[in-house]
Amino acid sequence: MSKRSVAAARGPPECCDMRGLLSFLILWLLSKKDMYGQEIAKELAKRKGEKPNPGTLYPALRDLERRGLVRSSRHERKTIYKLTEEGKKGLKKACYYFCRAYGEIFREYRDFCA
């Protein structure tokens, strides 16, 4: 089993609280396509190694919507979330920030990301 799959299977390490990255990950996922809540939860679980609690995910989505970064609409019995133009701009700013703040670390440990 690769280093990546071992880490993903266990979730985030105890030393690192990954909750602060939730909004960033949601924006990034919605930049790929519009999604409903359970679909977002599944995609987050693939990347973080654990499915987010609905009590964490849906308040984060509501906050992103309140800030104008995400828009929701009802389709049949599901709520679909879509990235707004403001959300696209916010994601670009966040990517710039993360690259500047963490890029050197990722380059140094790139073998863990492969």
What are these regions (language model features)?
Residues 76-95:
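Basic, amphipathic "hinge/linker" alpha-helix immediately C-terminal to the N-terminal HTH DNA-binding motif
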Residues 3, 89-114:
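Amphipathic alpha-helical dimerization/coiled-coil segments
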Residues 1-15:
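Short, Lys/Arg-enriched N-terminal segment that forms or immediately precedes the first helix
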Residues 57-59, 63-64:
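Basic amphipathic alpha-helical segments that dock to polyanions
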